Regions:
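Structured secondary-structure scaffolds
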Residues: 1-122, 131-137, 144-209
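Trp/Phe/Arg-rich N-terminal binding region typifying the photolyase-homology
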Residues: 1-19, 23, 28-29, 33-49, ...
């Protein structure tokens, strides 16, 4: 991605883009060594939805819907819900407002972003929220300030001034969140870098963590079929992802399948079945596959599917 970007554009015009790509790769590497941070966030979201006091539950619902009473913050989350995107600065402001002004659990704010952002990424989203909350760099928080918004997004304040006193400079005291995750580094799993073509009936499971099977090390395989399962990112997530996020995922998978069909000259299929593990096993059985190959997923929802997928394949 960076090579192609820099081939087409001068560095000064894409520097921020390059930085964001590098940050995403850094976050992915950090989370890969500390998978319990992802697991802990998932557990906390479930626990909080079950145990929140009713008043806090209603406030979570109001702020997440853009009904907090601070107009510029409400405009940010309303744009997110409507489009699936907001500028990176706005993401930081709203996250800080949620945690330090509203004093709501960071885990539930991260869940709002994860459900609505079209570019939601398990590592970048979870760890960025932890950073704002003072967990990623222990004790270092990020506080939203009206003067900062006025500097970088003056039009936002001009048209949305109601409640601005709540984020005036010096009005917000930081909240240091409690740490629930085990952040001890773990060894990385050593996956094979080459898949030998042993003349067996092979199929590729194409998933959202890597949509370039036509690039090595899988590029030279002779395949029976390639399949993708649109519910893989949603299967383990409650509440459900937004319809816009699901549609974006389905579009990306369809594009990957189209390129796979052209490159490998084999049939492809895309399923929207609610149980991707069962559907994957049925696909393997239907085509008489002897091996199912996939790129190793990074820590996140696709990796969470590996145990049930393995269990289903072992039974088929």
């Amino acid at each position: 991605i960076l090579r192609d970007t820099l081939h087409e554009h001068p560095f000064h015009s894409v520097e921020k883009w390059v930085q964001e790509v590098c940050w995403r790769r850094y976050w992915k590497g950090w989370l890969e060594r500390r998978p319990d941070v992802w697991d802990s966030w998932r557990r906390r979201v479930r626990e909080l939805h079950e145990t929140l006091h009713e008043a806090t539950r209603q406030r979570v619902k109001a702020v997440a819907a853009g009904e907090s009473g601070v107009a510029c913050m409400d405009a940010i989350v309303q744009e997110l819900i409507a489009t699936g995107y907001v500028h990176n600065n706005a993401r930081m402001w709203w996250a800080s407002y949620w945690i330090h002004a509203e004093r709501l659990p960071w885990e539930l704010g991260a869940d709002v972003y994860y459900r609505y952002l079209l570019d939601a990424d398990p590592a970048s989203n979870t760890l960025s929220w932890r950073w704002v909350a003072g967990l990623q760099t222990p004790g270092k928080t990020y506080l939203v300030r009206a003067s900062n918004i006025e500097k970088y997004a003056p039009d936002l304040l001009i048209s949305h001034r109601a409640g601005i006193e709540r984020i005036a400079d010096g009005a917000i005291a930081p909240v240091i969140a409690s740490e629930f995750a085990n952040t001890t580094r773990q060894a990385l799993i050593d996956y094979p870098a080459v898949v030998p073509d042993r003349g067996r009936r092979i199929g590729i499971w194409l998933h959202a963590d890597d949509l370039l099977p036509e690039v090595r090390p899988l590029a030279n395989l002779t395949l029976v079929s390639v399949a993708a399962f649109s519910q893989e990112l949603e299967a383990c997530h409650t509440p459900a992802l937004s319809k816009r996020s699901i549609a974006a995922q389905e579009e990306a998978l369809a594009d990957g399948l189209a390129r796979s069909a052209a490159h490998f000259s084999c049939p492809t299929e895309q399923s929207t079945h609610a149980d991707p593990a069962a559907c994957l096993a049925a696909w393997a059985s239907k085509h008489g596959l002897e091996e199912v190959v996939a790129f190793a997923p990074t820590v996140g929802p696709v990796a969470d599917l590996l145990p049930p997928v393995q269990q289903r394949l072992d039974k088929s």
